[in-house]
Amino acid sequence: MVYICADDYGISKESCARIEKCAAVGALNKISVLPNGIIPNKEKVSDLKVKFGLHINLVEGRALSAASDIPLLADENGYFRHSFAGLFLLSVSHKRKKFEKQLETELRSQIEFWRKTGLPYVIDSHQHTHMIPLVFGTLLKVLSDMKVDAEYIRFPSEPTLPYIKCLSLYPTYRPVNIIKQLILKFLGLLNKTELKRSGIKTALFMGIMFSGRMDKSRVEKVIPQYIKIAEKKNSDIEILFHPGYMLHGEKTGFSEKFSRFYFSKDRKTEYDTLQIRKGALK
């Protein structure tokens, strides 16, 4: 199985509409939903023939728990305080124990939100924060405590071989994406044992090295190598896109500090790539 996934559903009405359009033409089969975002048209969403997943969010917008219960995670107005780096530093600081307890509170709130939808537990996270070892371990604990039978969890530890073998793509690799890939691979090594112990299904992942540049030519060059690895491991593949771009003048309910990502022309590129794939999954 190849999952073609769009993240960040719920950023804005317009962004959601663009993701829905990709799904409606058969270019997507998985959409990850922000628990603290918006779902502009629930009836339309229910008509889409896709798998929906919970896009756990610990970095942007308002938390689902009371601000007074999670002061390390959220400010007095309930807005998340930290980036990925901030959460990681907090997880290895002297405040680790307090942070873990508050993290558990917020993760329970987000899992409970998803329980009410009645949808299968297909789990990933905004900016891949669940790969921080303390977050990963706490998430698995919450799932166990709440007796949640998770169907799938994203494990964004990309194989490096497909990218090493594509010499023609070397000039296009962004240094920031190389760093992200290395960090997530390292964190993947730390989380590997817990993942195996949990028994939750995952898939071979693509979407870090080409983040912001998931165009047709790049994806097609590395996908044959991905298929070989997946066949050898008897694994599914998950390919991540961010087609929910926004235009200037459109409003998001989230923080301005992240808005440059949503207005980025790179997201429009990924939207266009999926439109080229019309009907590919039908």
Give the location of each predicted region.
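Terminal accessory/targeting
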Residues: M1-Y3, Y9, K13-G118, V122, ...
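Divalent-metal (often Zn2+) His-rich catalytic cores of metallo-beta-lactamase-fold enzymes
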Residues: H128
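Active-site histidine-anchored catalytic micro-motif
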Residues: S125
